Amino acid sequence: SHNIANSSTVGYSRQRAKIQTSRPITLGAEAGQVGTGAQISAIERVRDSFLDYQVRVETAELGKYSTKLDYLSQVEGIFNEPSDTGISTALSDFFDAFQELSKQSTSSSTRVVVTQKTKTLCDLLNNTYSKLEKLQENSVESVKNSVKEVNSILEQLTTVNNQIRIASITGDQPNDLMDSRDNLLDELSSKFGIDVDKTQFNGNDITATGIGANLNPLVNSEPNGEVTRLSFISEIKANNDGTHTISYFVNGDTEKPKTITVSGLAATEVDTLKKTRILLTDGNGEMIDGKGNIVKDGGTIANPIEKFIPKSGEIAGAIEVQESIGSYMNQLDKMAKGLALSVNAIHSGSMDSNIKDTTKTLDFFVASDGKDEAGISAKNISINALILENPSFINTKENVDAGEGDGSRA
C-alpha cells in the first residue's frame, strides 16, 4: 500500500520486503528441526546506485548545455538575423544611401536620407551591444543565484544525512529519508558534477568532481565534520602594491559581505576569477588558501587560492557562455570601429595624397561618450551631431576645386 500511495511521488523508490527463512524449532531429543516458514527481515529500496551515478553525470552535462542553449538562443534573438530589421539590412541601407548620394550630391533630401540611415545603423549597433552586455550581466547574476541555491541544497543534504545516520545507528531502515537525499543529490548534480562516497551507517560524503581535492567535503557524513561552501565574488580591485582586494558574499548572501587581499595574482587569474565568480570557503564563509589554511575576513592571503571552476552543470554553462557573448561583443566592436575609421578616412580626405588641408572636413562618425576616434566601439558609435543637424556638411567632392555636383567621394 505504501508503494501505491507514493506512485506519483517525485523521487520515490519502490520498496520491497526482504524475506528470509525464520528460525526453525528444535525437537528436543528427537532428531531434526521443524521449519517455521519465512519472515520479513527488512524493507529495502529497489534502487540501482550505478544508474544513479550515470544519471547524475548526464544531468550535469544536460544542465551545462541547456544553460548555454538558453543564452545563445537569446543572442540569436538579439541579432535577429536574417531579417529586415537586422544589422546586415541596416548596413546595406547605409551603403545604398551613399550610393544614391554619389548620383545626386546636390539633393538635400538624399543627404537627409544618408544621415537617417546612418543614425539607424548606429542606434542598432548601440542597442545590440547593450543587449549583449545585459545578457552577459544576467549570466553573472545566474551564477550568483546558483551559488545561493547550491548552499541551500548542501544544508538540506547535511540535515538529511544526519537524520539517516541516526536512524541507521538505531537499526532502522530510513528508506524515505534516503529518497529525499537522492532527490537533493539529483538537484545538486544539475548545478555541477558531484562525487558521492558512501560511508558507514548509510552516510554520504559529497564533493564537487575534480575540485577542491585537498579540502573538506561539501557534505560531511560526520555530524560535526568540517565542510566546504561556495561564496560569490562581487568585486575584484587592483591595488597600487600589486595585490588585489576581493570582495565576496558568503554563501551568495548579499547581506554577508567579506573582503580579503590576495598577493601574487596574475592578470590571467584575475580574468578567470571575474568570469567564474566563485570562491571555496569553509562552513563559516572564511577563505581557504592553496594549503588549506583559513584566512579571516579582512586578512591577506598569498596565491594560489581555491577557485571553483566546474566542467559541467548549469554553473559551468553560465560561466562558459560569458566568453561566447564577449566574443560577439568584440566582433561588433571591430566592425563598428572598422566602419568608422574607413568612412572617416574617406570623408575627411586624409587618405588622399592630393588633399593637404582637411581641417574643414568633419569626422562622419564619432564616439558618443567623447572618446577620440580610436575609442569608437559598437557601444558608442554615433553620427557626428553637426552632420546630423546639417547634412550639407557631408563631403561628397573629390577635392575642394570640384564642382557642386561632384559626388565621387560618396
Task: Report the location of each language-model feature.
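Structural signature of extracellular appendage/secretion-system components
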Residues: S1-A410
